[in-house]
């Protein structure tokens, strides 16, 4: 029997986070109440502000508290002419950490999934098509996940790009650095062989 309804409510709320079960939620709640109440207050304030103030960029659909995010409003990024299509805002963070891309993004917030009733307009492809028609885009880099749905989504967007004479490319999928071939699955190995490149001296 719980001694505090508020404690129960806190633990239930924490369980909305991915990977957090009853035990983890209980541990988090007790830690905040026993050892870090000031941290808990900062978390509550940050969460409240984020939930009320963060929306979507009008151009790329990533998370931002501005109408247009810092990446899309950057003149150098605009001049680049490249758009990288990703499935989620988290993918932008991953790509930005590499320091290898200097263009802009478009976030689908998912992928095509006819069985789940998710069509082109549900993932913003009408907005992407509008950008292809109106902006000077030289290349669309398709960085959707290497899943069946991700590949289908990439192929659909590639066909869309062809209608506007915009080059479409797919990010390479292959053997991870430090990996051993015998441990790599067949699909990944097939992509690696198909995407091989010449060694020049």
UniProtKB/Swiss-Prot annotation:
Organism in which the protein naturally occurs: Escherichia coli (strain K12)
Keywords, sorted A to Z: DNA damage, DNA recombination, DNA repair, Metal-binding, Zinc, Zinc-finger
MF (Gene Ontology): DNA binding; zinc ion binding
Family: Belongs to the RecR family.
Biological process per Gene Ontology, one example term: double-strand break repair
Main function: May play a role in DNA repair. It seems to be involved in an RecBC-independent recombinational process of DNA repair. It may act with RecF and RecO.
Entries under Pfam families matching the protein: RecR_C, RecR_HhH, RecR_ZnF, Toprim_4
Superkingdom, natural source: Bacteria
Zinc finger C4-type: from-to: 57-72
Protein name: Recombination protein RecR
Gene name linked to the record: recR
UniProt domain Toprim: residue ranges: 81-176
